[in-house]
Amino acid sequence: MKNSIFIIVLLLVHMATFAQEGVNFEDLTFDEALAKAKAENKFVFVDCYTSWCGPCKYMAQAVFPQKSMGDFFNPRFVSVKFDMERGEGKELNEKFGVKAYPTFLILRPDGTLQHKIVGGTGMIEMFIEKVERGLNEKTSLDYLDKKYEKGKLNKKELVRY
């Protein structure tokens, strides 16, 4: 009996440890996430999802819990999730023009948009690559938008845009 209890406790501890290895999504309001990002000198990563979105559920269950995702995201971001059809998510949906799900926003601590990724993927390396592109000032959506408005995108940038 004692062995059984010990094994169960050991398994629960192992499962809890595994669950913490992925992306640490925090239960914060939008303003709290911005304040925390500013205090920690990080970006804000926003997972924009809906309750009925299959790819959103896949990202939440199979991609974000992966250790490699946590290793990449947790030092760089304050990560939060918002249902775009409920509560504060409705306001964010309108503010950032989210039209498809999942959409992922990379925001500066002042709340301005640095980058937007539309659509999920099961390929972790590919997703991290997209996020890295968004963190780079010269390849982020914000940078490309500004260059586009000035009519200064080269062919390679135009394809990426």
Q: Predicted segment positions?
A:
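Non-catalytic, surface beta->alpha helical segment in thiol-disulfide oxidoreductase systems
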Residues: 98-140
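Bacterial Sec-dependent N-terminal signal peptides
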Residues: 1-22
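N-terminal leader/targeting and pre-domain segments
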Residues: 20-40
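Short cysteine clusters
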Residues: 53-56
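Short active-site neighborhood of thiol/selenol oxidoreductases, capturing the structured segment around
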Residues: 40-51
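Charged, amphipathic alpha-helical linkers/stalks
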Residues: 125-161
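Thiol-based oxidoreductase modules, predominantly thioredoxin-like and allied folds used
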Residues: 22-28, 48-50, 62-89, 98, ...
